[in-house]
Regions:
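Short phosphate-binding loop-to-helix
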Residues: 68-100, 158
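Short aromatic-hydrophobic micro-motifs that form the base-stacking/packing surface
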Residues: 102-104
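Acidic donor-binding segment of Leloir-type glycosyltransferases
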Residues: 50-72
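N-terminal nucleotide-binding beta1-loop-alpha1 segment
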Residues: 1-21
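Conserved donor-nucleotide/metal-binding helix-loop-beta segment in metal-dependent transferases, i.e.
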Residues: 111-137
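Conserved alpha/beta core of the MobA/IspD/sugar-nucleotide pyrophosphorylase nucleotidyltransferase superfamily
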Residues: 163-199
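Short, glycine-/small-residue-rich phosphate/pyrophosphate-handling segment
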Residues: 147-166
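A short, N-terminal amphipathic alpha-helix
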Residues: 33-51
Length: 199
């Protein structure tokens, strides 16, 4: 067992339930195809990372999807909002004696294994690692112990999440990774020829 754990939060890829903001512009069918490609990309840059990995599903666990059971453990998200679900996943990980835990989503095409590896390394000398997203949220969060305030009193999915989180950890030593753009609306896809092929 590694002492490092990567949590990957996903939505079950079901028509009409993923990338709903994107779907308003390109329709549910294409939005689903884009999300499936984002899931595949997430698998590509995480599968060879030297850490333990858990995929957290939003609705139900699929034992026969792209996530290989030899590489990824599978769990179901639990909680009444995103903050609660993430907090519960971190709690579970720390209860299993992991030293460093990082959580990512599954809607970034530009996230790389190197960014995640650096985030784990930076936790040696920092309390928190945070990856800012261009929309005002964050795409990566890493900790060595649970900091409950991070997950409370947030307007999840809005542009205030990143700045609000920084206020919660003002007394902690924080490292920020490079800013990345998650894929939520059509303009987010402009620099990605692979994703543009779905338009």
């Amino acid at each position: 067992m590694s002492k490092n754990l990567l949590l990957i939060f996903t939505r079950n890829p079901e028509l009409g339930k993923v990338k709903t903001r994107l779907a308003k512009s390109i329709g549910n069918d294409k939005a689903l195809k884009v999300y499936i490609e984002l899931l595949n990309q997430t698998k590509r840059f995480t599968e060879n990372l030297p850490c333990d990995k858990i995929v957290y599903y939003s609705e139900n666990i699929n034992c026969k999807d792209i996530w290989d059971l030899h590489t990824y453990r599978k769990e179901l998200q639990s909680g009444n909002d995103l903050g609660n679900r993430m907090a519960n996943a971190f709690k579970q990980g720390f209860s299993e004696a992991y030293d460093k835990i990082i959580i990512i989503g599954s809607d970034l095409y530009d996230l790389t294994s190197d960014i995640i590896l650096e985030a784990f390394e930076r936790l040696d000398s920092n309390d928190v690692v945070l990856g800012p997203a261009t929309d005002g949220g964050y795409y990566l969060l890493g900790m060595k112990e649970l900091i409950p305030s991070i997950f409370r009193n947030k307007e999840w999915g809005t542009a205030s999440v990143f700045s609000s989180t920084l206020k919660d950890i003002a007394d902690k030593k924080v490292f920020l990774t490079k800013e990345l753009n998650d894929i939520d609306v059509v303009t987010d896809m402009e620099n990605h020829p692979v994703l543009n092929s779905f338009l």
